[in-house]
Each structure stands twice: as structure tokens, then as C-alpha cells.
Amino acid sequence: MRLALSVAVLALGQPALALAQSRPPSEVPDGWTMQLGGALIAGPAWQGSDDTAASLFPDVRVSYGDRFFASIPEGVGYNLVSSDAWRAGPIAKIRFGRDEEDGGSPFRISGESDELRGLGDIDAAGEVGVFVERRFGEGAAWRLRGEVRQGFGGHEGVLADASLTYQTRLGATLVSMGPRVSLASEDYMQTYFGIDPAQSAGAGLAVYSADGGLLSYGLGASVILPVSRNSAVTVFGSVERLGDAAADSPLIRERGSETQATIGIGYGFRFGL
């Protein structure tokens, strides 16, 4: 999971890494704040892999009031609309590349995969687009969020993500859970799951032309345990299934898995600037 810190998002799409933004804009401190931390994650070596790799991800976040935000997991964005019920604006992310030798996370500390050999490397990609978020229910406990992004560089596809998250407090502990789904265009699917004749000859897999459509769907959950007023430990996990266009690729059928599970633990400390 990719690196210009100013436009960063995890390659495998690890939304559970983020410490939940549980407070409405009216309760967010004015001015600049920063959060520093990290997370140890065990998950697929690459999207669709059945090999497990452990990675140590830095978690660096900068925000200005309830408007500007920048972090490795969530990218860089600006809330053009910001109220207790709605948030919306532009967003930019980066998707880390894929290395045919080992899977390619730049933060990998153990575990690797050699199942990509012969397919070639995929460069890092930038993704720019828009997001809309609606909070509702008692105490704004429910959050419905959607994003649409256009890729450039490593892939030139279009992605659309949607998630529904429920948050509740158990004493000082914040628990979040909910489903999510991702759609991708043919360009994206072909880049990561398609196999052209040259790749077929190099990797020993059948030629495959991937269609656009459902990329993945699944469930995620996180538990945030406050350590102090400005720091917390987060335990998180997710289980996802690849959609048919990805799962039907010979790469996944013969060398990967359509079920993708991730677990991790992180720590973050927030302070004003």
C-alpha cells in the first residue's frame, strides 16, 4: 500500500488504518494539528494474493480545522462543504506500485510473493477525484461515504468507493464497523488483473482480458482505545471478496485468492502546531 506524502493512500486499500474521525466539525479544534504514529499490518502481499506479508506503515496526518486534511491512509483533501451532517470536496491519493519480484509494498518488513514474476512491474499511480460524506442518526453515529477517482501514471482507470460505517462508544472506547464496496473501470482491471500475450508467455498464465465492474466488497471494523487525551491505540481488521472480473483472472484462480483478510494494530499521537 505509496511515495509522495502529500497525496498518499494505501495500495491495498486499508481504510481501517485510519483513526476514526468521530467528532462533528463544530467540535474540531481550530488551526493546524498533526498526528504521528504507525501501524503493523498483516495482509495480502498484493491485491488478490494468497501470500501474507507484514508491513510497518507510518501514519502521518496534518489537518487545518475542519477543512484541510492530509494523511497516508486518506490522501489529501479539502472540505468545500463542512457541516455536522455533510462533508464534500476534492481528494487526491496515491496507489503504490506492484513489484513482480516480491509484491512490492515499500513498507514490507517480512513475507513476500513470487507469483507475479513474468507479469512486469506496475508503477505507482496518482488518483484525483471527489468525495461526499453524509452523517446521520442519533449522535451522527452513521456515516455514508462515496468517492470517485481518476487514475494516472501506473493505471489510468476510474475507481468508485462506497462505505457505510456505524460508530459507537463503549465507555472511552470507540468501535466502528460496516460494509464497503469498490467498483473499477476496465483500464484499472486490465492493469492489475488482465494478462496480455507477452505476460502470458513470461508468467505461464492464460491470456485474460478483464472487464470493468465490481472490484471488491467486504466488511471492516476498528476499535480505538484511548491512551491519553491526545493518543490512542487502534486495532482493526477487514475481510473482502474480489468481484468476478478480478476473481476470474488466471492470476487469481491459479495463484491467488478471491478472499482477502487484513489485521493490524496502530498507535497515534496528536498535537497542535
Regions found by a protein language model. Give the residues of each.
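Outer-membrane beta-barrel "beta-signal"
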Residues: F57-R61, L164, E258-L273
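Structural signature of outer-membrane beta-barrel channels/translocons
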Residues: S63-G65, N79-V81, E133-G137, Q167-R169, ...
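Short glycine/proline- and aromatic-enriched beta-strand/turn motifs that initiate or cap beta-hairpins
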Residues: L19-E74, R98
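Cleavable N-terminal export/targeting peptides
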Residues: M1-D30, G272-L273
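Outer-membrane pore/translocation modules
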Residues: S26, I72-G178, E186-D211, S238, ...
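Soluble periplasmic/extracytoplasmic beta-strand elements of cell-envelope proteins
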Residues: Q35-A39, G89-I91, T262-G266
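Transmembrane beta-strand segments of outer-membrane beta-barrel domains in Gram-negative
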Residues: Q35, I41-Q47, S113, D211-R253
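Transmembrane beta-barrel architecture of outer-membrane proteins
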Residues: T33, S55-F57, A125-G129, G157-D161, ...
